[in-house]
Amino acid sequence: MASSPESAPPTNSTSSPSPPSNTNSTTSSPPAPSPPSPTPPQGDSSSSPPPDSTSPPAPQAPNPPNSSNNSPSPPSQGGGGERGNGGNNGGNDTPPSRGSPPSPPSRSNGDNGGSRSSPPGDTGGSRSDNPPSSGGSSGGGGGGRSNTNTAIIVGVLVGAGLLMIVLIIVCLRRKKKRKDSFYPEPMKGNQYQYYGNNNNNNASQNYPNWHLNSQGQNQQSTGGWGGGGPSPPPPPRMPTSGEDSSMYSGPSRPVLPPPSPALALGFNKSTFTYQELAAATGGFTDANLLGQGGFGYVHKGVLPSGKEVAVKSLKAGSGQGEREFQAEVDIISRVHHRYLVSLVGYCIADGQRMLVYEFVPNKTLEYHLHGKNLPVMEFSTRLRIALGAAKGLAYLHEDCHPRIIHRDIKSANILLDFNFDAMVADFGLAKLTSDNNTHVSTRVMGTFGYLAPEYASSGKLTEKSDVFSYGVMLLELITGKRPVDNSITMDDTLVDWARPLMARALEDGNFNELADARLEGNYNPQEMARMVTCAAASIRHSGRKRPKMSQIVRALEGEVSLDALNEGVKPGHSNVYGSLGASSDYSQTSYNADMKKFRQIALSSQEFPVSDCEGTSSNDSRDMGTKSPTPPK
């Protein structure tokens, strides 16, 4: 009995250091509990002392629960055994396991201990240590991975941006090279005097706009000589030049010498052989003859694709070489507009030159306006035709590069579709059939009654000459009379007859004396006033005083005031039709004398008989004449 009290204090002393180890566990002194942990197994042989020793440490028992409260997982481990001290020891071991430093003691205990109490502490420590350590490592790894992912994303974005910039630069350079190679500067010299006086640099800069604009307009064309845009060329065809657009493809003829810069593009349309056009027109029979005039004969044809065309055979002896002819046709073939007849192709065979146009099925304005036994054309239809023709001419004068002067505006060259929409034909033919050696040709360009005064005096034609001819055509639509009519005296033309009537009508607003009697007053006075004002401004003697075609378009549409065309001069004033000074005014007497002179020259060299064929697209200039003047003595 005496030995038991002596042995009890040592157990208390050995057990007493364990609570301080709990308090010191927070100060990272976990090695203290590890040496006494083997002592309980030594006194494990007697199970009685532990129950006696439970009473003294009772006041210190709350400390382990505090540590166990911080880590609730150890009670579940300690609760698995029946030994209270073993559970406390396990609880004492768990607080050090909360931090990273306690892990080495747990390993040393696992190495030194063979007791039963140490494995729970070790296992508890190992279980509690692993999650924090794994959590710490995973947290560090997650931060590293996020930084790596961010760097990868930034690198990809920067690389993509640089790639896009490089692609844009390459595309811009290729596009610039393509433009430079596809649109060379036009020929220098006087070869393009017919096409306005554009600067070569401006023409080369504006050429792409014209090219793009013409493509868009071609898609809108519906009523041409056979319908919409150009048809695919009939087989067999010559090898193409390989340009990007199938609609602008054509052969490069190897038999020719090296072409000039303007011909380097190749021809835009199709080339036809004489046999192909002969088969299309039935051998150029009279049954397919649409008309004839100063430029030659016009036959209707059908291509193997089923497309209807109008084949115009130009008369021989124009004085132009083959290369020059191709250059001029190349320019004309690029022109596409809703109110212009498009060129489909051409043919050169043993000096014979033919042009292939779209076929317009509803004949000409001349036919419907002056034909016999035909219904009277309504005034609204006349206004629509006048507006369409004005838009087509405005495109030739102001939107084409180089600009194109028609030179032969007249009612016979205004073709109509079944909706009575106007389409201007034969633009550029005056250049194709003129002598290329001199600007002023002995052959009369234009049509009597439509010629501008400056052409009669100087032999030169400009855009304002086309405006004058358009004004004469407006008078035809207003009055229903021809430019040179049998009902008018020989020395008076439609212009001379209408000038005083227009002045009075614009002053008092009464157009009955001027308007076509067949209309019987069925017209809109405001629309009639617009047409009369445009006609009066267009036929002024001075070309400088005539408006542009774009101004006429806006005036006919009612978008601008009519006073803008009068330039501040009252409509009834004589200066509206003349120049500012009497000395510079080209007198009507001189004009009539020059017209007689030109008529004599033209009639003396007449090669084609006057034709009244209804379907012609370009009647001869002399078709409008009523009488032949007395030959000069």
From Swiss-Prot:
Induction remark: By ABA.
GO cellular component: plasma membrane
Active site: 408 (proton acceptor)
Phosphothreonine: modified positions: 273, 442, 447
Enzyme nomenclature, EC number: 2.7.11.1
PANTHER family linked: PROLINE-RICH RECEPTOR-LIKE PROTEIN KINASE PERK4 (PTHR47982:SF6)
Protein name per UniProt: Proline-rich receptor-like protein kinase PERK4
Organism this protein belongs to: Arabidopsis thaliana (Mouse-ear cress)
